[in-house]
């Protein structure tokens, strides 16, 4: 009963956050939108900001991870990890995220429960020019809405700068980067990522990324790489799949993720 109540409370919280974001957005979409651009693919975020009046849902409906540490194997499935994005003002978007529902198996122990949520914003800092990369800032907080096993039980801040060098590259190529800091229970980690993309066709893209986490105070560095594909089914709908492996022991050994994104109105 307690678990059902907790899930119900999380649903109410999520619905409330989404309603607030919708009310805060402009009533009419402005301008003809470009093809959908999401933060779904790989670990880092896109530097693109949603146009005013548009609402975008990005859902990782299935994620699976395997790891082995101290001869103890673990399997972790995450369902419906979602991000809700609102084009609030020109060069500014509001965001709410839910980190998903977990099913975890470690050794002979099983556990399940909801993850925390997120409130954040993305703002344009620099426009692309001949001398500088397009750069945005993504900053926010995690909200402790999850079950104890999957929550920090605190409000944790984070931020990342997202410089993109895509406009310096040939038309079919892209390069986005992420440099920032996240906190978890007062422990800070420096996080980085660099994503390289190639447009196979007008609707299909391939991406590869190196990423990592370096504790600022103490702990072990974690580094990995991943790769994946996006398929723009329509101008406002995208499917994606990506997978990754660790480059050192502290990182997750292997993971795979599949997602769906839609922007409204079209």
Where are these regions (language model features)?
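Cleavable N-terminal export/targeting peptides
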Residues: 1-38, 266
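Transmembrane beta-barrel domains of Gram-negative outer membranes and organellar outer membranes
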Residues: 29-266
């Amino acid at each position: 009963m307690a678990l059902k109540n907790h899930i119900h409370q999380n649903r109410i919280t999520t619905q409330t956050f989404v309603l607030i974001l919708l009310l805060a957005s402009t009533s009419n979409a402005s301008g003809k939108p470009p093809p959908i651009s999401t933060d779904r693919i790989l670990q880092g975020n896109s530097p693109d900001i949603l146009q005013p009046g548009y609402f975008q849902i990005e859902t990782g409906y299935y994620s699976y991870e395997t790891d082995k540490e101290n001869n103890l194997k673990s399997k972790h499935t995450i369902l419906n990890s979602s991000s809700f994005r609102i084009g609030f003002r020109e060069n500014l978007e509001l965001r709410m995220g839910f980190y998903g529902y977990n099913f975890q198996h470690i050794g002979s122990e099983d556990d399940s429960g909801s993850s925390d949520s997120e409130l954040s914003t993305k703002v344009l800092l620099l426009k692309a020019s001949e001398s500088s990369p397009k750069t945005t800032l993504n900053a926010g907080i995690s909200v402790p809405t999850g079950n104890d096993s999957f929550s920090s039980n605190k409000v944790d801040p984070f931020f990342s700068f997202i410089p993109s060098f895509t406009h310096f590259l040939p038309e079919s190529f892209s390069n986005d980067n992420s440099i920032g800091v996240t906190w978890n229970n007062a422990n800070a980690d420096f996080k980085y990522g660099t994503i390289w993309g190639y447009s196979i066709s007008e609707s299909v893209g391939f991406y590869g990324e190196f990423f990592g986490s370096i504790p600022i105070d103490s702990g072990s560095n974690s580094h990995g790489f991943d790769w994946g594909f996006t398929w723009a089914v329509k101008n406002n709908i995208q499917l994606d799949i990506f997978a990754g492996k660790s480059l050192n022991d502290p990182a997750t050994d292997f993971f795979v993720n599949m997602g769906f994104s839609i922007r409204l109105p079209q």
